[in-house]
């Protein structure tokens, strides 16, 4: 990436994309400010909780782990420096109002 030490750059949104862009821009020397309208960062990687339940507000699966590996490697780090992954089985469970439920199993494709 070019030398951006003379540049001030605003990034709109503190989701995965915005935070990744800000990290790369800052690594190139830019003075970066990230703006986020919500009180939490993470974009769709949030959750809502209430009445004993937890809901993802976005992705429920860790897709394309190689992209996360490459991002952290670009900064001399590994994902495990920041978080642990645990395979869940079932992947998730869906509950209906009448008490029925369905489990979505953990299985690899291919």
Predicted features by range, described:
Residues 4-34:
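N-terminal Rossmann-like FAD-binding beta1-loop-alpha1 element of flavoenzymes
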Residues 12-15, 37, 58, 64:
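A secondary-structure boundary/capping signal
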Residues 26-51:
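Glycine-rich FAD pyrophosphate-binding loop
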Residues 53-67, 78-110:
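Dinucleotide-binding Rossmann-like beta1-alpha1 core, especially the glycine-rich loop
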Residues 72:
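Beta-rich carbohydrate-recognition and catalytic domains
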């Amino acid at each position: 990436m070019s030398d951006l030490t003379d540049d001030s750059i605003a990034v709109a949104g503190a989701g995965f994309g915005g935070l990744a862009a800000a990290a790369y821009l800052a690594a190139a020397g830019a003075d970066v400010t990230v703006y986020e309208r919500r009180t939490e960062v993470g974009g769709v990687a949030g959750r809502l909780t209430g009445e004993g339940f937890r809901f993802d507000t976005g992705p429920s699966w860790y897709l394309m782990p190689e992209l996360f590996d490459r991002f952290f490697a670009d900064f001399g780090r590994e994902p495990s420096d920041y978080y642990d992954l645990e395979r869940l089985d079932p992947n998730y469970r869906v509950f209906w109002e009448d008490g029925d439920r369905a489990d979505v199993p953990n299985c690899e494709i291919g």
